[in-house]
Regions:
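Alpha-helical transmembrane segments and their helix-membrane boundary motifs
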Residues: 1-28, 98
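PAS/PAC sensory module
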Residues: 120, 134-140
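Sensory-domain boundary capping and coupling elements
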Residues: 156-157
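Short, solvent-exposed loop/turn segments that connect beta-strands within catalytic domains
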Residues: 128-133, 146-149
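Terminal output helix/cap of sensory domains in signal transduction proteins
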Residues: 79-125
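Sensory modules in modular signal-transduction proteins
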Residues: 29-66
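Short loop/turn elements at sensory-signaling interfaces that couple input to output
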Residues: 138-153
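N-terminal sensory regulatory modules of PAS/LOV and PAS-like folds
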Residues: 71-81
Length: 161
């Protein structure tokens, strides 16, 4: 076999590998885009696409609360304006975060890779005037994968007191 044959073979294999990598990348990008679209289509709940560290990747929270400033770190408790998260600087760092029922359920759901629903809790939230209020919430979560990366689509609904 001559040298030209090997050069063409290597070039062909390289092109095929590049095409496969691009296809995988586009598939993951499309999966993520579909999840983001689902987040913004929901209007009766606050929707959060979060990773294992509770970092918010997408949300409709600020679209539904135009009077609330988008000035918090993109971590679940901070975006929701949880009093403990804001007072401590970051969701998950306060002493009360260890007993937060929402945090415990989501952590467990990530470990078990299972959906959860109808979790009710009372949250201490700040309103737009930075006044602390007690708010009953119902939380549901749906496991979603982008490629092999697990995320949760978390739905939070306020329950009137």
């Amino acid at each position: 076999m001559n040298m030209t044959y090997w050069i063409y073979l290597i070039a062909f294999v390289t092109v095929v590998a590049i095409v496969l990598v691009v296809r995988v990348w586009l598939k993951r990008k499309n999966e993520y885009a579909l999840l983001c679209e689902r987040v913004h289509q929901q209007t009766e709940h606050y929707i959060f696409l979060i990773d294992r560290k509770f970092r918010v990747k997408e949300t409709n929270f600020y679209e539904l609360n135009e009077d609330i400033k988008d000035d918090q770190p993109y971590v679940l408790g901070n975006v929701l304006h949880c009093q403990t998260a804001i007072d401590e600087g970051l969701c998950g760092t306060g002493i009360d975060c260890n007993t937060c029922p929402i945090r415990m359920v989501i952590n467990n759901a990530f470990k078990l890779k299972r959906n959860f629903d109808h979790v009710e809790a009372v949250m201490h939230l700040y309103d737009k005037d930075h006044k602390a209020i007690l708010q009953d919430v119902r939380v549901d979560g749906e496991l979603a994968f982008v490629g092999k990366e697990p995320f949760f689509l978390v739905k939070v609904r306020k329950i009137n007191r």
